[in-house]
Amino acid sequence: MGTLARALMRVVLDSNVLLSALISPHGSPDVIYRAWRAARFEIVTSTTQLDELRRASRYPKFKAVLLPHRVGAMVNNLQRALVLDRPPTDIEADDPFDAFLLAMAIASDADYLVTCDHRAGLLQRVHIGRTRIVTPVAFCAEAL
């Protein structure tokens, strides 16, 4: 017996993409977030990422640009996504804080991992398993 085909592509969004969607309402990260809200694809997240979003949104550099109620609404919305409780922990990344993103991509068999971070080495990997690692602009051009 074969497995059923997924109806929607699965996408892991780096926390920097999600925060960028809140900061700049007309950029490609916001286009991606709105496309997910319109059910154009499935977001994969984790309890680790939801905690990171809550924590990062309180950083002093974000206080002036992130409204707490918008961050709260995003976290609440993401709790309705595919939330992984404990992604694998044995994944290596150039930036150890990005390992959970790679783990989510592998555990969920995601189609894309979308990141804004050019310095951490995620984009240089190009893919992990079958998951393509791309910028928000590239994701919009390829998938939306």
Segments and roles (model prediction):
Residues 13, 84-87, 115-116:
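Short beta-strands and strand-loop turn motifs
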Residues 14-15, 47, 118, 137:
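Residues immediately flanking
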Residues 18-19, 51, 120-122:
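Short, active-site-adjacent cap segments at secondary-structure transitions
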Residues 32, 101-102:
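Short, hydrophobic alpha-helical packing/hinge segments within bilobed ligand-binding/sensory domains
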Residues 91, 95, 99, 106-112, ...:
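Acidic, PIN/NYN-like endoribonuclease modules and their adjacent C-terminal/linker elements
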